């Protein structure tokens, strides 16, 4: 009987409280005690495990028959066959105590199951969510918004030219006359419309691209057909007008333009100096005979003596 009392006396101070047991709930220091430092906690656990081993050895040596119950087990209402010390609940509690010892200082003095602990845990999660971006793979996290490129790194775009109605009409008329401008024509057109040469050049490039898309293959046909007649002959004007209005869908070519045609002069108004070429060769069938009348075959001045 004394052996049973000794075993009960040794086992009583070494009992371990579970977080959901009656003793833990009724503990007056549940919400006020501070968490132990890791070194002290490790020493306490080592001492506790040593006492549990000694108590288990005494219980095994004094109680060979498993049907008998110890006074401590009777008082606590625990089955002697169930593992009192070293159970899974105890191991979980020890792991929780070790993890609680490594928490920040604000966890000290706060029990795990208390409302204060839940509030601290929620605050920690919120601060972690604000400090670290949510992973794109998690189902509950919103998709990270794609950040727009900074304005300093972006290449500045060229401002679009706003042409007036008069400028557009003049440019269209010029494009109908000719699709390719020379340097002088481009300069004169830009000065007359109060534009820059670059603006006129870019407008013509865009207009040619649009015309080629609307009329595929027409540009090469117009250039090949218009190369035969000379611009000074009447056939060139007629051919140009026919190609514009006939089979070729190119822009119409005006019949009389100052920079495309040459004025014709009668033969009587053309004056050639007599000393520029010999009149005998002109009279004998030279290439200038069609341009000279019979009155111009004689010199205009009397020969010097």
Curated annotation (Swiss-Prot):
SMART domains noted in UniProt: HOX (SM00389)
Query: In which residue ranges is the amino acid composition biased (Basic and acidic residues)?
Result: 97-115
CDD domains (alphabetical): homeodomain
What is the annotated tissue distribution of the protein whose record heads this document? Expression detected in the brain, testis and spleen. In the testis, expressed in the germ cells of the seminiferous epithelium, predominantly in elongating spermatids and spermatozoa. Expressed throughout the brain with highest levels in regions of the cerebral cortex, hippocampus, diencephalon, pons, medulla and cerebellum.
| Post-translational modifications reported in the UniProt record | Phosphorylated by HIPK2 in vitro.
Q: Where in the cell is it found?
A: Nucleus; Nucleus, Nucleolus
The family database entries (PROSITE patterns) matched by this protein are listed as: HOMEOBOX_1, HOMEOBOX_2
Q: Keyword Nucleus, does the record have it?
A: yes
InterPro entries, from UniProt? HD, HD_metazoa, Homeobox_CS, Homeobox_NK-like, Homeodomain-like_sf
GO CC list: nucleus
Which intervals of the chain are annotated as region Disordered? 51-158, 210-257
Q: Name one GO molecular function term.
A: DNA-binding transcription factor activity, RNA polymerase II-specific
Query: From start to end residue, where is composition biased (Acidic residues)?
Result: 87-96
| Listed Low complexity bias regions | 129-140
| Residue ranges of DNA binding | 156-215
Key words of the record: Developmental protein, DNA-binding, Homeobox, Nucleus
Q: Which family does it belong to?
A: Belongs to the NK-1 homeobox family.
Q: State the function annotated in the UniProt record.
A: Transcriptional repressor. May play a role in early development as a Wnt/beta-catenin effector, hence controlling pluripotency and preimplantation development of embryonic stem cells. May promote adipogenesis in mesenchymal stem cells, possibly by inhibiting the expression of the antiadipogenic factor NR2F2. May inhibit osteoblastogenic differentiation.
Quaternary structure and partners: Interacts (via the homeodomain) with HIPK1, HIPK2, and HIPK3.
Q: What name does the UniProt record give this protein?
A: NK1 transcription factor-related protein 2
> What is the organism lineage in this UniProt record?
Eukaryota, Metazoa, Chordata, Craniata, Vertebrata
């Amino acid at each position: 009987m004394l052996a049973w009392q000794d075993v009960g006396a040794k086992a009583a101070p070494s009992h371990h409280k579970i977080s959901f047991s009656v003793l833990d709930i009724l503990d007056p220091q549940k919400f006020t005690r501070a968490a132990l430092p890791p070194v002290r906690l490790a020493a306490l656990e080592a001492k506790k495990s040593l006492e549990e081993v000694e108590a288990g050895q005494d219980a095994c040596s004094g109680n060979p028959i498993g049907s008998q119950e110890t006074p401590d087990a009777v008082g606590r209402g625990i089955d002697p066959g169930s593992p009192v010390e070293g159970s899974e609940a105890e191991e979980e509690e020890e792991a929780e105590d070790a993890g609680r010892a490594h928490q920040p200082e604000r966890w000290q003095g706060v029990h795990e199951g208390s409302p204060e602990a839940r509030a601290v845990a929620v605050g920690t999660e919120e601060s972690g969510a604000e400090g670290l971006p949510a992973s794109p793979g998690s189902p509950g996290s919103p998709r990270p918004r794609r950040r727009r490129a900074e304005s300093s790194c972006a290449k500045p775009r060229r401002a679009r030219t706003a042409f007036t109605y008069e400028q557009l009409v003049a440019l269209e008329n010029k494009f109908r006359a000719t699709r390719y401008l020379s340097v002088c024509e481009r300069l004169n057109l830009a000065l007359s419309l109060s534009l820059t040469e670059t603006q006129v050049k870019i407008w013509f490039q865009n207009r040619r691209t649009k015309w080629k898309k609307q009329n595929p293959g027409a540009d090469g046909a117009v250039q090949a057909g218009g190369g035969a007649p000379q611009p000074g002959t009447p056939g060139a004007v007629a051919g140009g007008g026919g190609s514009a209005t006939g089979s070729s869908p190119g822009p119409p070519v005006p019949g009389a333009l100052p920079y495309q045609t040459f004025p014709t002069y009668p033969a009587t108004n053309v004056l050639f100096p007599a000393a520029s070429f010999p009149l005998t060769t002109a009279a004998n069938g030279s290439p200038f005979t069609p341009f000279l009348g019979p009155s111009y075959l004689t010199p205009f001045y009397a020969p010097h003596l």
